[in-house]
């Protein structure tokens, strides 16, 4: 059994300023917690192979997927298909889970 405590994972800051804690990473999937400060947004990007799910835990913001924009709040879950441009922006402090299958990789991620 492999159980990871959030507190045991060292957070890192991405180039767009979001804070990430990668909780699990196998070849077939990955799970990370991401946080954004009010007004902050992830860089608009897509994944060539990975399908991604965002689950909002705390806060509110807007999620854009392929030009469609929607407000998100706690326990909203969004499916982001491979090849879909996406970006999330925090209206207030925002904390969400990111699940990728196959697992997240920098090589699979393309930015504008």
Give the positions of each predicted feature.
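Short acidic-glycine-tyrosine-enriched beta hairpin
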Residues: 68-82
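A short, N-terminal "cap"/entry segment at the start of jelly-roll beta-barrel domains
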Residues: 1-30, 109-112
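Ligand-binding loop in jelly-roll beta-barrel domains
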Residues: 82-106
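Glycine- and acidic-residue-biased ligand/ion/polar-headgroup-sensing regions
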Residues: 49-51, 56-61
